[in-house]
Amino acid sequence: MAAYCSGSSGSGALTQLIAQGALDAYLSQNATFTFWKVRYNKHTNFAMESIGQPFNTAVAFGSEAQITLNRNGDLIYYMYVVVDLPGITACDTQKEACAGIAPGGQFPVFMDQSCAPCAKNDEAAIADYIDDGFTEASSGEKQNKLRQAKDRWLRDKYGAGASLECCDDVEDCPDNLCPELGGVWAHWTNDVGQFLVRCARVVVGGSTVDSLYNDFLFMWEELTGKSGRRLTEMIGKRYTRTQLICDSRQRRVLYVPLPFWFTQHSGQALALASLQFHGVQIHVEFERLERCIVVSSPSVVVKNTATACCLAPNDLSACLETTYVYLDNVERDRFATTHYEVLIVQNQAFHMQTTNSQVRMQLNFNHPVLELIWGVRRQCHEKCNNWFNYSGIDNRDPVVSAALYLNNQSRFSSKPGTWFRLVQPYQHHSNIPDCFIYVYSFALHPEDASPSGSCNMSRIDHVDLNLQLQDGLGKEQVSVMVFARNWNVLRFREGLAGLAFAN
């Protein structure tokens, strides 16, 4: 231990201390602070409390619920939709007696003809690479010819070597099932918490200030979720089908954050104290039940584990969990009597369906835009209720390249899809997404509360985003979702609030 605990005269440290040159004048001479004394700021007095509140209208799958926020505190900060999701089990009407339950067919079947996830469409994409004689070949020969055709396609399109069959466990093959589950099963779709919130709107004084959609909720978490703080269990996210099935068998409470502007930074918290004459409402539209579940066969019906009855739209329960901030009298009076403005971030959405591999979208966005976020979803994934799967053919990038035009002038030269999926998030976001989400940021730091760059699309007549998709996607229908995050100003006057700039 002597070698580890040997002493020192400290002369080396002193040598470093006096070794000063001309360049040190830029580093440490006339210092303005020290690392060896804590400097802090005093803050105003406050307290926080998280309060749950039921919706004012009925909650059900496929319905819109509305809530008027109670004036429990002076400010509103964090906000969650709390979903009480029932456990579900599968009952095969062809194999057992499912008392009091109608025949199946309500939910998509995983791996049937219409939902294989996109395997048939992938085969169509490589059809030009298949050797002659495929139709007359035996089933084994057909599989071999398909494999050879895929290898040619990979070499031609991606410069890739032959594909490998390297799935040897459940983690590598997420669709392999634990044998103990048997052949009859049902599960909630992945990330079901976020998917359930089809649309959430915040309404102040009868006017919608901002709207969030489930695709945006998923994309925003992928871009901003930080290590150790990913939502995973909060929203029902899993990585294998076995995990999804096992989780779905029990009742769960999910917490779905709503990333409105006032939840992102404390300085932008929504001041109820400034809204004596305006109410704040949250409207949440929930997804339809048949879009939320996947089953093992057409004859399967889904039962609520708590009641043993067929799952119904009104089996959904939800409330809103809101963090209220309480201020002392002086600061509360300041909010109540002062006229002021808050810089906020809104979200705009564009959606289109196409069967063309060359997509030209005219984006009718307004206001100074911080960034554009987009994704592509194949119809064959939608048929499987695989809603947040934005992958293309062979689980590759669906976007080959992208270009942006402002008034028919190129904003930047066409760049590969991977540049928008990897480099842009690396430069401007907290996280590089695990899936095929694409970003172009006009701001240096689009997650911050302070402006760091934008493009005022209200002053541009034509904004065109051109995407070159994989060639094979031109043979099927795909959905393209584009979201724009923009700045606006919320003005508070005489107990009322409204946007300074309308669309």
Name what the model sees in each region.
Residues D131, T135, L154-R155, G159, ...:
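Generic surface-pattern signal
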Residues M1-C118, D128, R152, C166-N503:
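Short, low-complexity Pro/Thr/Gly
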Residues K142-E165, D169-V170:
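Repeat-associated, polar segments at repeat-unit boundaries in modular proteins
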Residues D122-I130:
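Non-transmembrane amphipathic alpha-helical segments
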Residues D112, E136-A137, G161:
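Intrinsically disordered, low-complexity segments
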Residues G133-N144:
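Charged, low-complexity interaction regions
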